[in-house]
């Protein structure tokens, strides 16, 4: 893997049936994450929370709109294979269910599987260039999906 930092790009998705967003960030580093997001509780994200990771999934607040949701960050999306996308999608699903106080167990596995698949599909859209990154020069309140 090259040590050169890749330009950060931000993608936003709206799951429609859940009152939260999914943000996928590719490239960049802590400074980019901090510029766009706060913790879910509105605090600053600590550098130790996002440093030296191959990927990250956390509950966040989007600074620009104060919207709540899930951030999945891939410093280099080219390295994201099916197992890694599945891994982060599972974390994202569990984070979102936790945010909304929804139960996760064998009795509601269909909703868990559906949401994890949706997360993975969004990441795949980013990886394959099927969606455009947000342009943050203007206020953005619409999703790319």
What is the role of each PLM region?
Residues 89-105:
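Catalytic Zn2+-binding segment of zinc metalloproteases
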Residues 134-145:
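Short acidic DE-rich linear segments
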Residues 3-4, 60, 144:
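Compositionally biased regions
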Residues 80-89:
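Short alpha-helical catalytic segment bearing the HExxH-like zincin motif
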Residues 1-54:
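Non-catalytic terminal regions of proteins
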Residues 38-79, 92-96:
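Active-site scaffold of zinc-dependent metalloenzymes
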Residues 104-134:
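Post-HExxH zinc-binding segment in Zn-dependent metallohydrolases
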Residues 79-80, 107:
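Short, surface-exposed coil-to-beta transition loops
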């Amino acid at each position: 893997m090259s040590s050169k930092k890749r330009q950060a790009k931000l993608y936003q998705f709206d799951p429609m049936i859940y009152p939260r967003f999914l943000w996928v960030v590719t490239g960049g580093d802590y400074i980019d994450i901090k510029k766009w997001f706060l913790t879910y509780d509105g605090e600053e994200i600590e550098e130790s929370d996002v440093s030296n990771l191959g990927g990250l999934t956390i509950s966040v607040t989007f600074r620009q709109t104060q919207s709540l949701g899930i951030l999945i960050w891939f410093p280099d999306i080219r390295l994201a294979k099916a197992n890694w996308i599945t891994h982060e999608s599972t974390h994202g699903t569990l984070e979102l269910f936790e945010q909304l106080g929804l139960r996760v167990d064998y009795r509601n596995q269909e909703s868990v599987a559906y949401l994890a698949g949706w997360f993975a599909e969004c990441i795949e859209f980013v990886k394959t260039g099927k969606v455009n990154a947000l342009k943050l020069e203007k206020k953005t309140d619409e999703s790319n999906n």
